[in-house]
Amino acid sequence: MDVVEKLVINGSGSSKGGTFQSVEINGSGTVAGDVECDTFSFNGNGKADGSVKAKAVTISGSGKIHGDVEAESIRMNGTGFIQGEVSAKQLKIAGSSTFGGTVKADGIDISGKAVMEADCETETFQSEGKCKISGLLNADQVIIKLSAGESYAREIGCRHLQVTCRKGMLTLLRLMPQPVLTAELIEGDVIELTNTKAKTVRGNKVIIGPDCQIETVEYSGDYTCDPSASVETSTKL
């Protein structure tokens, strides 16, 4: 990358896009146009009206990107919104983030809240927060640790899915909603579920754990079901 200069916006100013060494928005500034840089960081209430291509993108304040984002690393520590498609090696979400387009990454780690309005494709998907995926979650390995409230994925397709539950004191005292994963279809090789509601679960090895409500289970290998779980129909393929 040909480095041109650093771009720093401290306040409510605006700048056109371009190629930079780094871009930093510390106020409510706006970058109008596509940006290519090494690092792009939001520390205030900033906005990028174009697409962003960078090695690292960090949102620590409240940042909005209205185009596509291509980066090696994306870290969302604040409130982030990316309207376009996302392509990254690593995506880490510790704040509250919304993605309007398809999300593709080698690894996704969620400890905050993530809303994905389209499909999500990754090798490894880990969530200890809350997630809502309106499309297909396609991954090699999916590990979801539920804590409170509902996480949702319309469809999950993976090699290995493990859903566990960690109930905090507020949940045990019924001051917070019970943790649950809700899905229309779950399909994979090895599926281990806890606190899950699904219409169809299809896999080779299927383990239905406590507090699950499943309409249909289809399995080709092993199948076990916890006594506290509800499964309307189970069929060996």
From Swiss-Prot:
Pfam families: Bactofilin. Belongs to the bactofilin family. This is Uncharacterized protein YhbE. The lineage of its organism: Bacteria, Bacillati, Bacillota, Bacilli, Bacillales.
